[in-house]
Amino acid sequence: MAAVTRRQFAPLKPGAAANSNAPRLKGIVFDVDGTLCEPQTYMFGEMRQALGIAKSVDILDHIYALPTKEAQETAMESIRQIERNAMASQVAQPGLANLMSYLDRRSVRKGICTRNFDAPVAHLLGKFLEGSLFEPIITRDFRPPKPDPAGILHIARSWGLVKPVESQREGPGDKAAEGTQGVQGDASELIMVGDSIDDMTAGRRAGAATVLLANDVNAHLIDHEHTDLVIRRLDELIPILEEGFSGRELASST
């Protein structure tokens, strides 16, 4: 039997949260390219050409699968150079400054989870968002990258948002599985904002609500099962958060 649910958060408007049964938003995680800045999708074609791979092949998966550390570093540097060239022409997304100013006024924590390396991220923040704090910033140096939820869960844990994890038992001696820890990050009170299927899938798998920043290229993700809410400009989030976030209805098995 399917139950209909929707992701909700209490209003950020001062005084309004007391009248809401919805959980309070604890923070927002942002993608970078196509989210904080306008898409530079031409980079991906240049990267694949430099690496000699088809469009269907994930760029980072290909690099990490190369047989030696030297080959991996050579390939990684080739795509870093493409990103360095592109960052000079970064353009802020419409509504970027307004949204960040609002989140800072409402004391909403902000983090970044991106498949970029650190230089383009630092360039964007220095050029368009000087003085606005993003912490932590997860770049491609953190593995595994999106669509794996690990980066978002790491951010949640760094903010003190954790939940207990039951130890998995195995073997005749009922020995705890190797690597099992007592707690893990809990992203259920976070929002992931992005423009790609990797963003939506990572957010959903982490347990966060997801917001798609829609454009002409990613319109096919508007109705995707991993997308909770859709905006066309970043500052469209302001009235949504102020009055109370409410995602679309989702059917789940019970």
Predicted regions mapped to residue ranges:
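Short, acidic loop-to-helix structural element flanking the phosphoryl-transfer center
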Residues: 85-112, 118-122, 149
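Hydrophobic alpha-helical core bundles mediating ligand binding, dimerization, or RNAP-core interactions
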Residues: 44-48, 80-83, 121-124
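Conserved Rossmann-like nucleotide-cofactor binding loop
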Residues: 35, 42, 118, 198, ...
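Short, basic/glycine-rich phosphate-binding loops at helix/coil junctions
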Residues: 72-83, 132-136
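Active-site neighborhood of HAD-like aspartate-dependent phosphohydrolases
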Residues: 2-62, 68-71
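Conserved SAM-binding loop
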Residues: 36, 110-113, 192, 230
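Asp-based, Mg2+/Mn2+-dependent phosphohydrolase catalytic module
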Residues: 1-26, 101, 122-254
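Short hydrophobic segments within beta-strands
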Residues: 31-32, 113, 193, 213
